[in-house]
């Protein structure tokens, strides 16, 4: 089984530091982290998407991570179990 979390951050510059702090605390349950945002030579997107591959057996920690992220005003987190 795979437990994937998608995290949308907008505006990225406002919410990203707090998201980073939360993800650092839960680092032991994060297998893979991929950050996506549009960037060109002259501009950088104000929103971003982070994809996490989480330890499926860490159900309580995943629930806490989800709750903490969704408590932030500019952040939306969704879980997907495959």
Protein language model features and the residues they cover:
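Long, contiguous binding/interaction regions
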Residues: 1-82
């Amino acid at each position: 089984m795979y437990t994937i979390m998608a995290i949308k951050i907008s505006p990225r510059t406002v919410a990203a530091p707090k998201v980073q702090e939360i993800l650092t605390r839960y680092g032991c349950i994060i297998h893979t982290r991929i950050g996506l945002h549009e960037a060109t030579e002259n501009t950088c997107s104000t929103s971003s998407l982070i994809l996490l591959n989480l330890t499926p057996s860490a159900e309580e920690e995943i629930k806490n991570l989800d709750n903490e992220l969704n408590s932030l005003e500019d952040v939306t987190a969704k879980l997907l179990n495959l």
